């Protein structure tokens, strides 16, 4: 990492090597010390592992699941390069609504750009219930998902809570009231106020981070 007085020599490629293409709002959680090397972390819907580069380099105990076999293979290969001691069975092809882990396994659960692929409210709630089940008391659930916040007049309703966005994609969308109600129903506590990024009026992504308080 670059020292403060050496910022001019800190090249973007060096930062990318250390952190990968990490979600900037997840990066914020790292900066604030909410996800640390001694934690056991699950990336639920890991894709190619882009959010795990730094965690693997820091020797976090990392697990990753995805419904795509190729995604799981790519994430495992990433781990083999960055943290070769990570067991192969930490990388599993699973659906979020049917996780194989024991209750309260993880200190932090990351679920970035996944929940909006829900088929409807029942599917959404099942995925979320599993993420919450495997999160330990005192742990952090970090999610980013598409929402209707800021796009209320630009989306076309389809069915079961799914909408067509201005960018032409179909997504399951939540709003502020749904997220706040769900936080209360889970017995959780917002780690931060809801934050929504409007991407040029084409889609909106909301960061929803929740503490699971000790029982």
Located regions from the model:
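Class I (Rossmann-like) S-adenosyl-L-methionine-dependent methyltransferase catalytic domain
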Residues: 1-36, 42, 47-97, 142-215
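Flexible, active-site-proximal loop/turn residues at the rims of small-molecule/cofactor binding pockets
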Residues: 115, 127, 147
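A short SAM/SAH-binding and catalytic strip from SAM-dependent methyltransferases
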Residues: 108-122
